[in-house]
Amino acid sequence: MTDQLEMIDIHAHILPGIDDGARNWEETGRLLEAAWAQGVRHIIATPHFSRKTDMEQLRQLKAGVRELAHRKGLELEISLGQELRYFEELPLYLEQGRALTLAESRYALVEFKPGDGFQTIRRQSGNWSSTDLFPYWLTQSGIFAFVKQAGPRSWFRAEPVCRSMQKA
């Protein structure tokens, strides 16, 4: 049994040269090493969604990141997803595979506007049946707030962001 908690990072901008994540392969390597040192054993690369995204390019970059981790001796599982800013057609994009869920699961990382309250989120996502949502907000203090449970007794839980990955 290990003394260290093994974690899954479900929101990582580790693909080099994509959006606001790692700028190059060297930076990606440093992020992988920092994640490994903190007990992360599975990283879901989540570049920002765009209607113009080249899915094949994302898959090739994911394969490259997996190979880089292997060369560094890091037994990291690397999966693909997307950070999805809510828009009306998003459920259709998910159903058609034009937007990615987290690691090909039924879960999606969906961002709503900071001012959107729970009722707005519930109204916008209420029809989704095949995909569960992880709506979140990034606060100025670096805290993600995820909707933990839907329904009248819903509550929000704050999760600290992997701080050393922010600094890397």
Model-derived segments and spans:
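Active-site neighborhood of phospho(di)ester-bond hydrolases with catalytic His/Asp-centered motifs
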Residues: 8-10, 43-47, 79-83, 138-139, ...
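Feature captures the catalytic cores and cofactor-binding loops of soluble hydro-lyases/lyases
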Residues: 168
